[in-house]
């Protein structure tokens, strides 16, 4: 087993001609795709992995300097694709991993057939002519809550992000993977995500992009998906689902899985 494979817990499933890469967002790990994977393995080779810093990875491998920007994660994705000799893939990125895919696709467009983004945002902070959904003051309070009592913060953050019923399995699952992260790593990663601004990179994306999001998402207002659609350099399409929450593939799989499969199977009509 190579160091990339071991560090990221890479798994290759299925045996199709085309490769689908599933990349998870903050506070989760590859298990967030458990409802989708069974529907893909008969038709595709599926690559799943854990982002460095996830609770399932070795915290000793987490390099705070490397992962102080999203580029570090993008180069991890490229390293995984090269390690497993993936010629070109359909990349499905959730939340921050959508933007990681954007960066990776600009660096190596040859490795990506298309991007399918779920709950993606190029910038979370509001700006002069841009609505991201957050003010700096909100984020500073969030960071302080993480610092003071990480477990209590997880218990409050998970229901807000997932939405819906407080007792749902999805909230329990997200709470578990969130709490699995080492608190100092979680804070560093979340600050990096929330303070990043990738709007300037969008025109440089050349691969087609399928933008999928919930109608109601605390972290990503619907206008952000429209912003992505208007500013991405390649062809793009938006689908807003009748779901609630930032992790709809976990909380509303009955709605989301058919939508994801459709966007994975079919290309944008030119």
Swiss-Prot record:
Record field: transmembrane: none
Lineage top rank: taxon: Eukaryota
Keywords tagged on the record: Cytoplasm, Hydrolase, Nucleus
One Pfam family named in its UniProt record: Abhydrolase_6
Localization in the cell: Nucleus; Cytoplasm
GO molecular function: hydrolase activity
Residues annotated as catalytic: 95, 217, 246
Annotated family: Belongs to the AB hydrolase superfamily.
Protein name: Karrikin insensitive 2 receptor CA
Organism field: Petunia hybrida
Gene label: KAI2CA
